[in-house]
Design a protein with these regions (language model features):
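Flexible active-site lid/hinge loop adjacent to a nucleotide/diphosphate
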Residues: 155-246, 251-253, 258, 265, ...
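C-terminal helical cap/extension that packs against the catalytic core
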Residues: 43-55, 364-420
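Residue-level signal for inorganic ion chemistry
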Residues: 12, 24, 73, 114, ...
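Walker A (P-loop) phosphate-binding motif
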Residues: 99-141
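N-terminal leader/targeting and accessory segments in enzymes
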Residues: 1-98, 102
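Short internal beta-strands
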Residues: 31-37, 217-221, 353-354, 373-382
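Nucleotide phosphate-binding/pyrophosphate-handling subdomain across enzymes
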Residues: 2-7, 17-27, 271-374
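Beta-strand->loop->alpha-helix junctions that form or flank phosphate-binding loops
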Residues: 60-61, 97-101, 234-252, 303-307, ...
Length: 451
């Protein structure tokens, strides 16, 4: 679609929506920003645009008569596709795009795209480093922090875009086609948005929707859903595994990550050379290395980059040691599966801070993973009573309830012995007490340093 002169509704007045509106204006379209919040501060929204134009801003009830004037709708990631208003767009025959689709349509060059329940940000950051070390023009975008829409007009045919893509963004893609895609894993998450696990899986798998036989999809062999999915898709499938050798793919053999192609078996790196902890991070390295290899990067360059890579903030991030107690920030552990990986990475008796916003998750597997390693479970947030009840039902009773994160850090410092670890890995979203998981992690680090 040629966007020039088109009237485009941007649904959502947050960071993503404003970024999409800025891009649309730069591409010659006429963006209209809409938000369902009747009390929206329109002046504040205007101040957040790039300042080169003055978009129309609609707030509150949607003016139904305006439907006929629209050519396209761009949904922000936080807008559910099952809203009656969104359904009316489809019924009217309007194209409905995600911001990812908009950025892809206006960008150039190759796209390497990563999705999955957990590990996306670390894998995206690592792949971004590998590609950045090997290529001239590389953009690392998406949920990792830089909006895809803010960079697409800077891209050339020689550019490489490394994109972290969420399930929310995949719901409304149309032509989005990565040269290399990866689905790292699929575990229970966002059921408050997708309602069923089957729907969540379907949306994640859309990342391969437009890939052809010359494209590549990297999948986790140890995820049964993904292993079966890989049997019936168009792109070339490359599996990774941390538990077994593969006939073809990338896998962990003892402490050595190996890549096996149709022609040869290539050592990539030893796990002891890596600066990031845990088996889940070995899987992230395998996924990023496979993607880079099939994007044309040499093994030598991949090896150098992965050895230099350090953990991104809020992912089992070492904060400090005080009185013999090590403090780790894993605020990105926003669901039980991610939080399990945080516990698995600990090699000390652990005081675990958990709880937060309820995404309708089950916490049983997370609690069962404590396996003698967790000394105390210190709970905060909306889910603290729900998690306490689940833990007691499963026989774990060393539980302390706190009003907030500051109190939880203080209690952990009082209870911890030299040689212990204090781990913030909440298994829940941050909403309600914090704006996002980054703010939660930053506050944890502040409270720890103030002890």
């Amino acid at each position: 679609m040629d966007l020039k002169g088109k009237k485009v509704l941007v649904f959502g007045a947050g960071k993503s929506g404003i970024g999409a509106a800025d891009l649309l204006e730069s591409a010659g379209a006429q963006p209209v920003i809409y938000d369902g919040n009747a009390d929206l501060d329109k002046e504040a929204v205007l101040h957040k645009t790039n300042g080169k134009y003055t978009p129309e801003i609609w707030a509150g009830d949607f003016p139904e008569r305006a439907l006929d004037s629209l050519d396209l709708v761009v949904l922000s990631p936080g807008v559910p596709t099952d809203l009656p208003l969104v359904k009316s767009f489809y019924e009217k025959g309007l194209p409905v795009w995600s911001e990812v689709e908009l950025a892809y349509r206006t960008g150039k060059g190759e796209v390497l795209a990563i999705t999955g329940t957990n590990g996306k940000t670390t894998t995206t950051a690592l792949l971004g480093k590998i590609m950045g070390d090997a290529r001239e023009s590389v953009f690392v975008v998406g949920n990792i922090g830089t909006a895809y829409t803010s960079k697409s007009l800077e891209m050339s045919e020689d550019s490489v875009t490394v994109a972290e893509i969420s399930s929310f963004q995949l719901e409304t893609i149309d032509q989005f086609r990565p040269k290399v895609s990866a689905i790292l894993n699929i575990t229970e998450d966002h059921l408050n948005r997708h309602h069923t696990m089957e729907e969540y899986i379907r949306v994640k798998e859309l990342i391969t929707k437009n890939q052809g036989p010359e494209d590549v999809c990297v999948l986790n062999y140890e995820d049964e859903v993904l292993r079966k999915f890989g049997e019936n898709i168009v792109p070339k499938v490359v599996y990774f595994s941390s538990l077994r050798k593969l006939d073809q793919g990338i896998y962990l053999d003892g402490d050595q990550i190996m890549l096996k192609t149709e022609k040869e078996e290539i050592p990539i790196v030893k796990t002891e050379e890596l600066k990031i902890l845990g088996r889940h991070n070995h899987e992230n390295v395998m996924a990023a290395a496979a993607m880079a290899y099939y994007a044309g990067v040499s093994v030598e360059s991949i090896r150098k980059s992965v050895c230099e890579f350090v953990a991104v903030p809020h992912r089992i991030e070492y904060v400090t040691e005080k009185n013999g107690v090590a403090y780790y920030n894993d605020s990105k552990g926003t669901n039980p599966d991610a939080a399990i990986k945080g516990i698995q990475a600990m090699n000390r008796p652990t005081l675990l801070i958990g709880g937060g916003y309820d995404k309708e998750s089950s916490y049983d597997e997370w609690i069962e993973s404590f396996d003698g390693k967790v000394r105390y479970l210190v709970l905060i947030g909306q889910t603290k009573e729900k998690i306490k009840a689940a833990a007691e039902r499963l026989g774990f009773t060393d539980i302390i309830l706190c009003e907030d994160l500051k109190e939880a850090v203080r209690v952990c410092a009082e209870k911890a012995n030299p040689g212990d670890a204090v781990l913030l890995s909440p298994a829940c979203a941050s909403w309600g007490q914090f704006d996002n998981y980054e703010q939660r992690g930053d506050m944890f680090k502040e409270y720890v340093k103030a002890l």
